[in-house]
Swiss-Prot record:
Name this protein carries in UniProt: Histidinol-phosphate aminotransferase
Catalyzed chemical reaction(s): L-histidinol phosphate + 2-oxoglutarate = 3-(imidazol-4-yl)-2-oxopropyl phosphate + L-glutamate
Known partners and oligomeric status: Homodimer.
GO molecular function annotations of the record: histidinol-phosphate transaminase activity; pyridoxal phosphate binding
Gene3D superfamilies named among the record's database cross-references: Aspartate Aminotransferase, domain 1, Type I PLP-dependent aspartate aminotransferase-like (Major domain)
The keyword Amino-acid biosynthesis is annotated on this UniProt entry: yes
Xref: InterPro entries: Aminotrans_II_pyridoxalP_BS, Aminotransferase_I/II_large, HisP_aminotrans, HistidinolP_aminotransfase, PyrdxlP-dep_Trfase, PyrdxlP-dep_Trfase_major, PyrdxlP-dep_Trfase_small
Amino acid sequence: MEIKTQLRGLPPYQPGKSIEEVKREYGLTDIIKLASNENPYGCSPAVKEAVMKQLDHLAIYPDGYARLLREKVATHLGVNETQLIFGNGSDEVVQIICRAFLSPNTNTVMAAPTFPQYRHNAVIEGAEIREIPLVDGRHDLEAMLNAIDEQTRVVWICNPNNPTGTYVNEQELTSFLERVPSHVLAVLDEAYYEYATANDYPQTVPLLRQYDNLMILRTFSKAYGLAALRVGYGIASETLIREIEPAREPFNTSSVAQAAAIAALDDQAFIRECVEKNKQGLETFYRFCEENGLRYYPSQANFILIDFGIEGNEVFQYLLERGIIVRSGNALGFPTSVRITVGSKEQNERIIHALTQMLKEKQLI
């Protein structure tokens, strides 16, 4: 048997350590996970009731078109139902886009470092990857435009960017979209959209009326707290959605996930509360960094990337042994940094205490 050439040597996605894994490995009982940008407050209480109602129907296939969720999201966004495509997380919508647009003899343009699934799925389709280095942690939009040619099919903007938390503002984005050729799909991945509070963070849904080659990705995994249920979606023109729908797997979002997402979307008060707490948590980390002379990127997401000036794996291991899971920057393109999810007030205080002790022990302050 012979697999596709591009799969040879392509590593599978490596998730961070789970809480149970750390408990077993280190004999610890009190673990906090601040590695995967999950919502530390969970999901809306209304979600649990919605999920329970679905438990009597587990033998029945889900609605493959996600009609009720589609209606709810369309109303929430002010778009037509036919402008939406749903996925098993927005990761799957990334996969659908790559399936639909990329092949050998095409190329795709993206920042580096950024969310790794753009590259991963493009490699599987045999496309050339054109990675444009970040400048000061931000997308270099001019260089990305210059990398586009006749064979380019997709350009990706992660906004806010993962792992830096930086963002492309409204003026920068509209200037960029004006110059993206019509044969290139511009994908705006807004997984952390709900957390962005900057006054000039772009409101992109209205831009769909101007740009037929624009697609926006969003998810219920982050602010909505449904990471375990895997549901995300893409927003684009009716024509574009119709053309890529054949690349979507049938029944790709479960009945439980659809019901949970509807309930989560209904509770915007919960989202507002989480966003405010996240903003306060970021300020706590900013103060810690500034008091200790540490470099960081101001974030529009629910995480912060901090440069400690030593191996990120060393910081990761120090925290792991104390029951705190973060993400080492070694795997993210920032070898002397770690990415920390903003937790609850108590979680933030615990990790900052541990990091302060580390800085003292390693004589970094």
